[in-house]
């Protein structure tokens, strides 16, 4: 019944069926993963994390999504040292595919950042994504380099990255650099901008900080 509900995109019913069949965790290898996934889809993220922790000693709890949820939970609770061991385990997914590998590398960079309070400057293997991560790391450290990195992203000819103006503005306002905010705002072409940037410009022009 749970599988049928899932296939019909009814995650709420699927969770109910899976809840009533939790004894299968110990006998069905894929049950725990399916249960955790449906909880997340249904918005019950904290419950999914609790279920993973309760079954952490079982082999069927060692899957990518479970480890990812535990990592995020540690980030939320600022348990960065606890993440070191988990990231060592997480590394086994780096050979699975680009998706898993990139997530592992990005999360590791951020965990290192939170522990050392230093940006990871040597990791440029992911192109624009690496540059974006670098900008946010500089923001976290409140370093002035954030501005130039954001402008490199925004002015890139590899695609439309104008949405990062929003984050650049936020960082400038946080640092009370209102003059730069107004200068950049004047260069925005409303007709060629996204709704997010249009609304941001409206707030800035009205000095609604």
Where are these regions (language model features)?
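Generic helix N-cap/helix-start motif at coil->alpha-helix transitions
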Residues: 1, 25-32, 59-68, 94-107, ...
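N-terminal leader/linker segments that initiate helical-solenoid repeat arrays
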Residues: 1-35, 41, 49
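Long, low-complexity, polar and repeat-rich extracellular regions
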Residues: 3-6, 78, 137-139, 166-167, ...
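Residue-level signature for tetratricopeptide repeat
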Residues: 4, 37-38, 73-74, 107, ...
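Alpha-helix C-terminal capping/termination sites
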Residues: 7, 41, 72, 76-77, ...
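Alpha-helical repeat scaffolds
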Residues: 13-20, 45-59, 80-94, 115-129, ...
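Mid-chain, structured segments of secreted extracytoplasmic proteins
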Residues: 29-73
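Alpha-helical transmembrane segments and their helix-helix packing motifs
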Residues: 65-66, 73, 78-85, 111
């Amino acid at each position: 019944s749970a599988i049928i509900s899932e296939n019909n995109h009814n995650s709420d019913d699927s969770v109910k069926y899976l809840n009533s069949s939790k004894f299968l965790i110990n006998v069905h290898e894929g049950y725990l993963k399916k249960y955790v996934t449906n909880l997340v889809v249904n918005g019950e993220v904290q419950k999914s994390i609790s279920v993973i922790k309760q079954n952490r000693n079982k082999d069927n709890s060692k899957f990518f999504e479970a480890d990812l949820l535990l990592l995020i939970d540690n980030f939320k609770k600022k348990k960065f040292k606890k993440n070191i061991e988990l990231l060592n385990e997480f590394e086994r997914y780096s050979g699975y595919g680009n998706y898993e590998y990139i997530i592992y590398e990005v999360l590791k960079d951020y965990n290192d950042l939170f522990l050392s309070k230093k940006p990871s400057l040597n990791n440029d293997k992911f192109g624009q994504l690496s540059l974006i991560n670098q900008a946010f790391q500089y923001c976290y450290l409140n370093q002035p380099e954030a501005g130039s990195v954001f402008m490199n992203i925004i002015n890139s000819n590899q695609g439309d990255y104008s949405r990062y103006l929003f984050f650049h503005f936020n960082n400038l306002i946080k640092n009370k650099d209102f003059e730069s905010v107004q200068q950049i705002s004047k260069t925005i072409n409303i007709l060629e901008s996204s709704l997010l940037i249009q609304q941001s410009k409206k707030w800035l022009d009205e000095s609604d900080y």
